[in-house]
């Protein structure tokens, strides 16, 4: 009899349940479950559902793997504390790149980045292998990195059944792995590493751009994707379409084509230049045409501003009209942009927002406060850039506090100062809040389609609507009984810079959620 493996999606569950992006289902845990299903009895569950069953349920499995982000270590620890002594325990996901996560969670091993080659070997050996941090008591072994893989797992769409609100969620489907940004930060790192100005990462050719004589990780300093997943490579189109079709058969209505930059799709193999060659228009057209014909609503995740032009914007608008799309601006200070390793300029980012808006999409502009090198001058420039982004058509300004991510160039920097304690961070955060509240007020009186997805966690008699084409969550007073429907709602007010209130105008569709819930998860 084959051994049993439980994969737990604990992404964002540090407090015991997800409080943000509850309408998002990532690709990672489903990919890992699919990778192992031919050799093991695999089950997939979310951390929230596992708590409802009882954490003691993990005792039934020979191996337990948990997908985490930084901040989810406590959730993993609580699970692992309920396993038997002979159970093999591992972590994966973005949080696994920190060797300290092994000690915080009590896991035996942490899979860094891609699982295709690493995880099967790890479960066979149950010992140190390349691409894994392995714990021995309070010591951590690292046999070394594993070369990047060109292999993509064939994802079993049936694993989406592990997610209770899948019918209303935005389900991510991987189309590109890695990142093409070879640029590096020019800031001196805490351990003394500093750019020597050799020019390889910005002016070199091919693989030369990926090599840094000073050992500085590639990519934007705050991001670990290039250093963990390597240069960009595209997933075969037939595999993408196969997964999308399978998800639709499972009741999925919204799909997000997931990539560090959708415009890298089909642009080349093992791409190390974020600017050239230009996007492969025909490859993108085939991707969008063949996926959009199967699903109700198609999103693209991210676009690099330096690759976007009017032709590409109009192509995205043709197949994804009315949906939200992310543009990373990060800061309004041109000097800081280059210093953190960003390949796009501020001018390019603002132009991309304008082009996307004109093409019928709803761009969201992303900024970071507390970055290394932040000054009051850079904060003022960032506040100005936020206002310009709104003028160019940004529907939302998203701001994040800089937090060091393991395996990124800035991984050893301290977290950025909070708005409470720092005037520059406060200026950026307050500007974003005011702009977002003003943008939400523009919505009052408008009618949109939402999926009434779940009761309000704070007001159980109310319900939360997830806008069909993306946007702020809609609080619907007294609408708990409408959970499981698609409705047209009128926006009536602004609750916060992230939530609006609304009233139901009419029910468009009653969805047979019970039939979907009755389908068993593979395993």
Curated annotation (Swiss-Prot):
GO terms for molecular function: 4 iron, 4 sulfur cluster binding; catalytic activity; metal ion binding. This is Uncharacterized protein MK0932. Residues 193-447 form the Radical SAM core domain. The lineage of its organism: Archaea, Methanobacteriati, Methanobacteriota, Methanomada group, Methanopyri. Disulfide bonds: none annotated. The keyword Lipid biosynthesis does not apply. It comes from Methanopyrus kandleri (strain AV19 / DSM 6324 / JCM 9639 / NBRC 100938). The keyword 4Fe-4S applies. Keywords: 4Fe-4S, Iron, Iron-sulfur, Metal-binding, S-adenosyl-L-methionine. It holds the Pfam family Radical_SAM.
